[in-house]
Swiss-Prot record:
Cell division inhibitor that blocks the formation of polar Z ring septums. Rapidly oscillates between the poles of the cell to destabilize FtsZ filaments that have formed before they mature into polar Z rings. Prevents FtsZ polymerization. The keyword Cell division applies. SUPFAM superfamilies: Cell-division inhibitor MinC, C-terminal domain (SSF63848). This is Probable septum site-determining protein MinC. GO terms for biological process: cell morphogenesis; division septum assembly; regulation of cell division; regulation of cell septum assembly.
Length: 282
């Protein structure tokens, strides 16, 4: 006999939408300096975002004080929720008092890159409370720390709206949003996403396919989030906080050129580089 469902709570298996903070050095001073350099101009950018500390890039004999790293992340207003570690690291990783998490390839299974045990550069990962960790993510640069962008969690394959009053029209692989998105709202589409209103600062649109925005883009736009390198972003006015395709991203810390800022543009990937080109609509 199966237990009767409780009207008060429910326990379910699920994934968590979070960032991965990939540690590649044991030098906390260098790590602190790099965080300051990258985020001091935009202190609110990752404010209150959850983050998992990923230590799988460290050598077998290297350890880091995870409690101090958690405090360091808190200083830039991130919220550490756990640690991603190899099985050989579990002993010391447990000492920080943070839960051990599993970062999996969002397409399912393990993602093997060009070298054994590595993923391709810049790919995001969904985080879930499982003990068997996936291989470490490779780095696209020589930076001391690496931020990976999140995959939005979802249930039953349905597109998500983070607030009431947003109308979602879905036709096969295309999701249409006919209202402006305010700060804090988030939309996820399994295929292409079309937005007819403004995406405000602090709002976020995420799609596994292309993103089309027929209004100013001032928040975040993440296309091709399951590793689709052919995805593109189109918008009629580019003023974005962040743009990303297949996990390769650009933020406001790198100002947009004058010929594309506030202009109609298309954005795509050329190998591992984001390309931004003005759209000539007339």
């Amino acid at each position: 006999m199966s237990p009767r469902k409780s009207p008060f709570f429910e326990l379910r298996s699920g994934a968590v939408d979070t960032l991965l903070f990939v540690v590649k050095t044991t030098d906390l001073a260098e790590m602190r300096a790099e965080l300051t350099r990258r985020f001091e101009a935009t202190p609110e950018f990752f404010a209150n975002d959850t983050v998992a500390i990923d230590v799988r890039r460290l050598a077998e004999n290297e350890r880091v004080p995870l409690a101090e790293i958690a405090t360091l992340l808190g200083s830039v207003r991130m919220r550490p929720i756990g640690v991603v570690a190899d099985s050989t690291q579990h002993g010391w990783a447990n000492e920080a008092g943070l839960p051990l998490l599993d970062a999996r390839d969002p397409r399912g299974g393990r993602n093997h890159g060009d070298e054994a045990g590595e993923e391709a550069p810049g790919k995001p990962g969904a985080v879930a409370p499982k003990p068997d960790a996936a291989p470490p993510a490779d780095a696209a640069s020589n930076a001391q720390v690496q931020m990976q962008l999140p995959i939005a969690a979802q249930e039953d394959g349905a597109p998500q709206a983070a607030a009431e009053g947003v109308r979602i029209g879905t036709s096969s692989q295309t999701t249409v949003i006919d209202k402006p998105l305010r700060s804090g709202q988030r939309i996820y589409a399994k295929g292409d996403l079309v937005v007819l209103g403004m995406v405000s600062n602090g709002a976020e649109v995420i799609a596994e396919g292309n993103i089309h925005i027929y209004a100013p883009l001032r928040g975040r736009a993440l296309a091709g989030v399951h590793g689709n390198h052919d995805a593109r972003i189109f918008c009629t006015c580019l003023e974005a906080e962040l743009i990303s395709i297949a996990g390769i991203y650009r933020t406001t810390e790198n100002p947009l050129p004058a010929d594309v800022h506030g202009k109609p543009v298309q954005i795509w990937l050329d190998e591992e580089k984001l390309m931004i080109e003005p759209l000539r609509l007339t």
